[in-house]
Amino acid sequence: MFDRTWHISRFLLEYGADVNIKNRYGSTPLFEAICNCSCKNVKLFLENNADINEVDLDGDATLMKIFNYNCRIHSGLNSVHLRIARIVIPYLKVIGLKNKHVKNVHAYKQNINFFNSVKQLRLISDESDREINRMKNTILRKNKFGNDITMYDILLEKNMNQLVQIIKNPLIKKRCSELILFKRIVKNNIIYIENRYQKIHGANTVIEFYQYEYTDKWMILPQEIKINILCYLDNKELDYIYESSLENNKNNTSDKKYDVCC
């Protein structure tokens, strides 16, 4: 599994391949890619929720064993191994920040402890911690009663309703471009939030134009209130509103044509 064939991996994932499927040796595509130092495949699998804390047939963290093997066989890690480490460590950190219970998982603890025990890897881990702290202090919106919205919220996809309302602020992409280790994760989260922004505003538009029986009640609400209400819906519900509103308009148009003909 090499960088030159990463588009095949992407094709298979798009058509429903299991990103965590194991071969006869108990290894998943992610760890095959790590063993072959395929940066493109590693990024692809992690973006598609590959389990970075997967264990091998002995019940130990596969990630730790791969890096430990490379450390012993090469008397340290070379530049390619460190490039892979700079990809996986941020994902490992985010998993621990999003889910506190993960910190008690045996494989996660093995991975973290190993990365902190090797100087080359510890430097990357420390760099990632400093970048996390900068994100915590990068305020995107100040709130009256505290709980300011920061780049850290985008990293962890917290306070999604407020993020949707400010996602078009050019400051966000500017601050994202200044990141190093977490840039890819934050950039993908921004794309997700922008997509949700489009769905929310699309749902609002079709309600205003096509849901005739609710238009009067909906239109008297301030725009901010309407958006806040729609923020409580998930993407499937927003898609349903959009599609059903268009279908409702189509049926109403057909009825009017029928009335004219009669």
Swiss-Prot record:
Alphabetic keyword roster: ANK repeat
Leader sequence residues: none
Positions of ANK repeats: 25-54
Pfam families: Ank_2 (PF12796), PRANC (PF09372)
Name of the featured protein: Putative ankyrin repeat protein FPV243
